[in-house]
Curated annotation (Swiss-Prot):
<dbReference type="GO" id="GO:0005524">
    <property type="term" value="F:ATP binding"/>
</dbReference>
<keyword id="KW-0547">Nucleotide-binding</keyword>
<protein>
    <recommendedName>
        <fullName>Phosphoribosylaminoimidazole-succinocarboxamide synthase</fullName>
        <ecNumber>6.3.2.6</ecNumber>
    </recommendedName>
</protein>
<keyword id="KW-0436">Ligase</keyword>
<dbReference type="GO" id="GO:0004639">
    <property type="term" value="F:phosphoribosylaminoimidazolesuccinocarboxamide synthase activity"/>
</dbReference>
<keyword id="KW-0067">ATP-binding</keyword>
<comment type="pathway">
    <text>Purine metabolism; IMP biosynthesis via de novo pathway; 5-amino-1-(5-phospho-D-ribosyl)imidazole-4-carboxamide from 5-amino-1-(5-phospho-D-ribosyl)imidazole-4-carboxylate: step 1/2.</text>
</comment>
<dbReference type="InterPro" id="IPR001636">
    <property type="entry name" value="SAICAR_synth"/>
</dbReference>
<dbReference type="Pfam" id="PF01259">
    <property type="entry name" value="SAICAR_synt"/>
</dbReference>
<comment type="similarity">
    <text>Belongs to the SAICAR synthetase family.</text>
</comment>
<dbReference type="GO" id="GO:0006189">
    <property type="term" value="P:'de novo' IMP biosynthetic process"/>
</dbReference>
<keyword id="KW-0658">Purine biosynthesis</keyword>
<dbReference type="GO" id="GO:0005737">
    <property type="term" value="C:cytoplasm"/>
</dbReference>
<dbReference type="InterPro" id="IPR028923">
    <property type="entry name" value="SAICAR_synt/ADE2_N"/>
</dbReference>
């Protein structure tokens, strides 16, 4: 197991932002995205990290970005440290396997969620209103049911420590413009359907996932991460049983543990037992191995 990376400190590089999981450095023409082993749940960053999580997320993102190049270009320039600018080389031991050199795109203001199954906040909305983000769904669906067709349900992009909010497609049109909103919706559904079929052949159900897009040199590209256990719900196909929550290869395991505690879901986070940290790490690594055939 490699050394835990909870935060990065590269004095020679300009830190542009620290997100819940990623540290982003501005290299002038490009960005360096370093995926740490931090983990958040309910928008609160835990004190403990998950070993090799940054590696898993980076490798899964790179796998999916490659698979989707026939649908949309992505922001990756390279995931090989040897290709990074000279000033990054001295940090190679930290960067190896968990970092990407990427194009500097202008992010769209909405997050793009696609749901193929009814779960999570979508299930809660459906129980209350019979619809999700203004999309009416058939009556009588059970929790975790497969939807007749995948649905596109955008959300706002929340500031660190606050919650994203589901919005209607019409609201996204107001935020991004009609042409971009429609293009993004169509591409999101196309990516999801392709990924769903690939994952299905590897024993994984992608219940839902979230994408981010940006504009680079006038062109729409996909940015951030791509169908990782942080941005998606991955369920094991062999134990899928609608009618309740599903076991998963993602941080749902951690969320489920936190739900058993007397914790109000605001910072500071409660300490995590070693077993929860270990099992969460195993679930992330299992997702990587199942999808790509390679671990670490």
């Amino acid at each position: 197991m490699s050394k835990l990376v909870l935060t990065t400190d590269f004095p020679d590089l300009k830190l542009a932002a620290r997100g819940k999981v990623r540290d982003i450095y501005d290299l002038g023409e490009t960005l360096l995205i370093v995926t740490t082993d931090r983990i958040s749940a309910f928008d609160v960053i835990m004190n403990e990290g998950i070993p090799d999580k940054g590696y898993v997320l980076t490798q899964i993102s790179a796998f999916w970005f490659r698979q989707m190049e026939d649908i949309i270009p992505n922001h990756i320039i390279s995931t090989e440290v040897k290709d990074f600018p000279a000033e990054c080389q001295k940090y190679a031991d930290v960067l190896e396997g968990r970092s990407m050199l990427v194009k500097k795109a202008k992010p769209l203001p909405a997050e793009c969620i696609v749901r193929g199954y009814i779960s999570g906040s979508g299930w809660k909305d459906y129980q209350a209103t019979g619809s999700v983000c203004g999309i009416t769904l058939p009556a009588g669906l059970k929790e975790s049911d497969r939807l007749p067709e995948p649905i596109f349900t955008p959300s706002t992009k929340a500031e660190l420590g606050t919650h994203d909010e589901n919005i209607s497609f019409e609201k996204m049109v107001d935020m991004c413009g009609k042409d971009i909103a429609e293009k993004v919706r169509d591409i999101t559904l196309k990516i999801y359907k392709k990924a769903r079929d690939i994952a299905d052949g590897k024993g994984i159900i992608i219940a839902d996932t979230k994408f981010e897009y940006g504009i680079y040199e006038g062109e729409l590209i996909i940015i951030d991460e791509c169908m990782t256990p942080d941005s998606s719900r991955f369920w094991p196909k062999d134990s899928y049983q609608p009618g309740g929550p599903q076991p998963s290869f993602d941080k749902q395991f951690l969320r489920d543990y936190l739900e058993t505690l007397d914790w109000d879901k605001t910072a500071p986070a409660p300490p995590l037992p070693e077993e929860i940290v270990r099992k969460t790490g195993e679930k992330y690594m299992e997702a990587l191995v199942k999808l790509t055939g390679k671990g670490k």
